[in-house]
Amino acid sequence: MAPPAKRARRGLVPPGYKYLGPGNSLDQGEPTNPSDAAAKEHDEAYAAYLRSGKNPYLYFSPADQRFIDQTKDAKDWGGKIGHYFFRAKKAIAPVLTDTPDHPSTSRPTKPTKRSKPPPHIFINLAKKKKAGAGQVKRDNLAPMSDGAVQPDGGQPAVRNERATGSGNGSGGGGGGGSGGVGISTGTFNNQTEFKFLENGWVEITANSSRLVHLNMPESENYRRVVVNNMDKTAVNGNMALDDIHAQIVTPWSLVDANAWGVWFNPGDWQLIVNTMSELHLVSFEQEIFNVVLKTVSESATQPPTKVYNNDLTASLMVALDSNNTMPFTPAAMRSETLGFYPWKPTIPTPWRYYFQWDRTLIPSHTGTSGTPTNIYHGTDPDDVQFYTIENSVPVHLLRTGDEFATGTFFFDCKPCRLTHTWQTNRALGLPPFLNSLPQSEGATNFGDIGVQQDKRRGVTQMGNTNYITEATIMRPAEVGYSAPYYSFEASTQGPFKTPIAAGRGGAQTDENQAADGNPRYAFGRQHGQKTTTTGETPERFTYIAHQDTGRYPEGDWIQNINFNLPVTNDNVLLPTDPIGGKTGINYTNIFNTYGPLTALNNVPPVYPNGQIWDKEFDTDLKPRLHVNAPFVCQNNCPGQLFVKVAPNLTNEYDPDASANMSRIVTYSDFWWKGKLVFKAKLRASHTWNPIQQMSINVDNQFNYVPSNIGGMKIVYEKSQLAPRKLY
């Protein structure tokens, strides 16, 4: 008889928690809430202390401080009690200092003291301040500066470190100073870590770092800009060329890491799609550090010479919209996220958002008589919504050497499958019984059902006939749906192409065959285009999903009632039959079969250009799927991160003289890093046969390595090669 399974030690853990309390083991499963997750991290740190020969129970440690920071905004009673317990411990217990032989549970160890900066950096500064700047101490083991959970409305952490005579100059809130000049303030990490857990689960931690370059904005003003290309749509039949809209152009830039290529390299993605069956999005955190601000001046000589100087008093403005107050503007749909190459500097995209603008465009064709109805009406006063970051989101001011961390955001999303389905309606349920089986091998030897079609047993919905065939037998539901691909709907702000789930259609050049709806991506050098390509034309690819609706629209037909066998010409509507006497207009162009019986999978991850997560719509009736991203955040999503070089004015500034400020040309370089955590399920093999996996041939291998002058590209990879049954 097998010995009984050992139960995990519970310890003194209150109800509703797994790790919040002393004496429990570290294998209790997933934490129940953010406070419990902080407690688990705290327990792991304590275990590391004990292994190194230190007793954390008698001292106040950095792990205790991290727990205090992570639970400062806790809403649950256990988190509040734990928070105040360790605050009390902080007041009475001696301090325990982390050392390099004491590993953190969240990030690699680093020296706890920084070396002094080179003296020449502070020559000018020393004239104004006392000499002998002390070393700045820092807790390098704290995850993402403070590891604080970012709740709704939570405040990020800002650390301003000063190299002054006071020694340790760290503090919260905005501010400036010469701080960390010449001092390393972080790590550059682009590794993907795979931690294999129990029961076939894998924790995937994707680290990403980039050098970000930010110029000062062209203007410090918010501007309402209208795009008008009515000259294009004034020609009959050119409705799809419509670009008219209004947008608010802001002086801010958006740091957007919401694309697969920001986090995974091609080798990582190959490992994930070949070995795992589903992905769960767990948490996200990001940080800005090693801020550098410089001014640019130009000499009056010929030719002019540009001079670049560090400006220790200029500021970088940073704002985190943790409450999602501002319009949500994911940049992947415009291919404007952070770049995909870790060794290349990247830029944040200028932030702008749509403004309400009414537009009327009546459909026309080349044979239409008269001028098309082509009107833009302007903004309805009832719908005006003008957002500014300065009065909606807390803004932090960073100077050279300062840091900013968002804390940790925990996702609430449904998982994403990494397998595709092959079963369509014709492959659901029990196949018909065969009275005759083949007696020899060969493709020309078939089985035979044997029973006459009008004498078979089963269920149909035909009503007017007793014929039971593979075409007429009733299936449990409808797998996928047909949708008109080239369908444009009119809204009060103009026409738009209706999004559909990708299907398996026919040739896109045949008017009688529906296109498949697979997304087509256009992108530049930061996002996978061959870096030696010249000209302005972006590179493109069409992502042909394995997981589709299994449809074949050119084979559709509709039969008349009463149902007749065989069907005659006046009892059937074929894809090639015109509707309303219009040549080229048939029911596959306008027919939508989506309904309450429709079964459909989520959209696949598109590596590297696809969006990862999307925001849930603030509507009462919400869409079941989003076509841009496989993960849809419930209730809230990570706050957008905005940056801007603060105005660096000259003595000639006069607010009444001009709309343009008199500014010193200033730019910033800073380092950005983030951590995106997934949970994945290892794929088990349930079939005898091997399956197709993500691989490349010899010729394609050279797409992933640089040429002799550094030219390279990123080729998109499939994400759902492994098949699975759905019924």
Curated annotation (Swiss-Prot):
A Pfam family the protein falls into: Phospholip_A2_4
Disulphides: 633-637
An annotated Gene Ontology molecular function: structural molecule activity
Composition skew (Gly residues), residue ranges: 166-183
Binding positions (Mg(2+)): 323
Family statement: Belongs to the parvoviridae capsid protein family.
Protein name per the record: Capsid protein VP1
Organism for this UniProt entry: Canine parvovirustype 2 (isolate Dog/United States/CPV-d/1988)
